[in-house]
């Protein structure tokens, strides 16, 4: 991704800027590069995420692959990582990484995060830990990680859990792991599910509008331990 200095718009360049650095890694790892999508991360949908899952599992079966690194825009990085964590059947190291600064910005972190991700993906200890997210020297589980700031390079955090490992100059260090990890086999993503966030004073206006839409389900991020403002209840009861 590159930032237009006049407008501030960030958009994909003609090609992935990381590709020109691939030869520098040949002495350590043998990289197979596949440019699956070339689009901003807000354009990602579950359909593209499912395509990624299919490609990963197929490549692992067909080729002698020991690890996978996915470069991804940070806006929906956690969503893609979590989707893959739930659906990829392969147990080899799978790492999702990105950059908080565009490739033409001062202090761009994309290359460093990419190299860190390659180190983790080529580490045998990273296997069977589910999908991992690697940025800013930290290794997070896709199950717990979330983006906490719009621009800070330390934006990806795992609240209450913290990172499960670190990338250091000496190598990759894991200090704990998930106790439980499970995956699901899916062949298509076709259901239309609406997500709503509850707020103080919320009424049933949005819920009433959804009643007339072709949706298959509603997920409500409620208050407290599942509480909702009383004025939302009439539509829910219907």
Could you tell me what each predicted segment is?
Residues 15-25, 141-225:
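Accessory alpha-helical/coil subdomains and C-terminal extensions
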Residues 70-72, 95-98, 132-136, 197, ...:
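Short beta-strand segments
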Residues 2-14, 76, 82-95, 110-116, ...:
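A glycine- and small-aliphatic-rich helix-loop capping segment at beta-alpha/alpha-beta transitions
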Residues 96-168:
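Internal gly/pro-rich beta-alpha loop/helix module
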Residues 62-77, 213-226:
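Short acidic, glycine-rich surface-loop motifs adjacent to enzyme active sites
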Residues 1-59, 234:
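ATP/NTP phosphate-donor binding region
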Residues 51, 110-113, 231-237:
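Charged helix-capping and loop-helix junction motifs
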Residues 70-92, 228-237:
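Short Gly/Thr/Asp-enriched flexible loops that form oxyanion-binding sites at enzyme active sites
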